[in-house]
Amino acid sequence: MEDEIRKAAEILAKSKHAVVFTGAGISAESGIPTFRGEDGLWRKYDPEEVASISGFKRNPRAFWEFSMEMKDKLFAEPNPAHYAIAELERMGIVKAVITQNIDMLHQRAGSRRVLELHGSMDKLDCLDCHETYDWSEFVEDFNKGEIPRCRKCGSYYVKPRVVLFGEPLPQRTLFEAIEEAKHCDAFMVVGSSLVVYPAAELPYIAKKAGAKMIIVNAEPTMADPIFDVKIIGKAGEVLPKIVEEVKRLRSEK
């Protein structure tokens, strides 16, 4: 693994425009459960009922009860991998973080340019009267076990700005992510199985454009053949080592 860490660091140290793409695996190390896999949430819950737009419109309570069961996880803390990515941005290497996660841990770790393909929990909208709220306005109610209700019209159809099954990705964010993939010289995937489309197309776009490719994941993926550097391991252990090696390489110049 040390040899692969060195290779990844060499790519990033030379990069003028690196992009990081993250999935559920990076947040799993902060205690947020993944959705797929042996211990994934979809083995316990029916996503059609608790995480689809049709299910939400049919029964918003089911969505919020699912969220309440995970409420301790919704307030997780960034882990060393999030901080390492933010450090690479501060060093001028990483120009954008593209994430499939909705937990805002990248921002809390210090990353400034984060493209959230699946939205986030920070804003909520009433589907009936279109009133907009900050998540902070409902935290107290949520912690008491009460589901959000529109303060203006009384509707229970108050939905966070997350992409549920059956909804399209935010088109502007997706466009920006595609542009980043086209123009980067290094593309690093962290904690993604690369099975959810269209997001999983981004590494292929970057590869076609000539970017050097790095993946850090807990297990192999079907996309591994397109990567120049493949590291199997925990992001929270691997990324800080990559950052330290990047700093060492830069100090030698």
UniProtKB/Swiss-Prot annotation:
Q: Which cofactor does it need?
A: Zn(2+)
Any idea which positions bind Zn(2+)?
126, 129, 150, 153
What UniProt keywords apply to this chain's record, in alphabetical order? Cytoplasm, Metal-binding, NAD, Transcription, Transcription regulation, Transferase, Zinc
Q: Which GO molecular function terms does the record list?
A: histone deacetylase activity, NAD-dependent; NAD+ binding; protein-malonyllysine demalonylase activity; protein-succinyllysine desuccinylase activity; zinc ion binding
Q: Which SUPFAM superfamilies match?
A: DHS-like NAD/FAD-binding domain
UniProt-annotated catalytic positions = 118 (proton acceptor)
Per the record's keyword annotation, is Nucleotide-binding included, yes or no? no
- According to the UniProt entry, what is the EC number of this protein? 2.3.1.286
Q: Which residues bind NAD(+)?
A: 23-42, 100-103, 191-193, 217-219, 235
Miscellaneous comment as given in the Swiss-Prot or TrEMBL entry: The two SIR2 homologs in this organism, Af1 and Af2, display different substrate specificities in vitro. Af2 can deacetylate histones and peptides corresponding to the C-terminal part of p53 in a NAD-dependent manner.
**What is the name listed in the Swiss-Prot or TrEMBL entry for this protein?**
NAD-dependent protein deacylase 2
